[in-house]
């Protein structure tokens, strides 16, 4: 490891921190299982919603998930390779023509439905 310098050193450190995650893209509906520490106990919370965007690469890659709860839109951004993500599960695959789905924010819940990939 001491022989590596510069960009090679950065890439080798990044490779050790990458997690094995399933393939998903904007338009897919995913479940994100998040580890939460509450004082002396630990639990897993599930956040299910539509992937609006995915950006970055390697260790710094993030994705944003949107869901509607009690009539209010909630968006959370997660690092893909975070240790707090227990797992990411793809519920269904959607067909979209954009990489960033910010237009979904302005649509009603019925109009914001995404076609499902067969």
Curated annotation (Swiss-Prot):
<dbReference type="InterPro" id="IPR001857">
    <property type="entry name" value="Ribosomal_bL19"/>
</dbReference>
<dbReference type="InterPro" id="IPR038657">
    <property type="entry name" value="Ribosomal_bL19_sf"/>
</dbReference>
<comment type="similarity">
    <text>Belongs to the bacterial ribosomal protein bL19 family.</text>
</comment>
<keyword id="KW-0687">Ribonucleoprotein</keyword>
<comment type="function">
    <text>This protein is located at the 30S-50S ribosomal subunit interface and may play a role in the structure and function of the aminoacyl-tRNA binding site.</text>
</comment>
<dbReference type="GO" id="GO:0006412">
    <property type="term" value="P:translation"/>
</dbReference>
<dbReference type="Pfam" id="PF01245">
    <property type="entry name" value="Ribosomal_L19"/>
</dbReference>
<dbReference type="GO" id="GO:0022625">
    <property type="term" value="C:cytosolic large ribosomal subunit"/>
</dbReference>
<keyword id="KW-0689">Ribosomal protein</keyword>
<dbReference type="GO" id="GO:0003735">
    <property type="term" value="F:structural constituent of ribosome"/>
</dbReference>
<dbReference type="InterPro" id="IPR008991">
    <property type="entry name" value="Translation_prot_SH3-like_sf"/>
</dbReference>
<protein>
    <recommendedName>
        <fullName>Large ribosomal subunit protein bL19</fullName>
    </recommendedName>
</protein>
């Amino acid at each position: 490891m001491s022989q590596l310098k510069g960009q090679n050193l950065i890439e080798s450190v990044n490779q050790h921190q990458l997690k094995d995650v399933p393939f998903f893209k904007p338009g897919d509906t995913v479940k994100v299982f998040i580890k939460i520490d509450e004082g002396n106990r630990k639990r897993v919370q599930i956040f299910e919603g539509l992937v609006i965007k995915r950006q970055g690469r390697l260790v710094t890659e993030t994705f944003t998930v949107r869901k509607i709860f009690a009539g209010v839109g909630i968006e959370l951004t997660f690092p893909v390779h975070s240790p707090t993500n227990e797992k990411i599960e793809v519920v269904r695959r959607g067909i979209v023509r954009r990489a960033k789905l910010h237009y979904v924010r302005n649509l009603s819940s019925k109009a914001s439905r995404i076609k499902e990939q067969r």
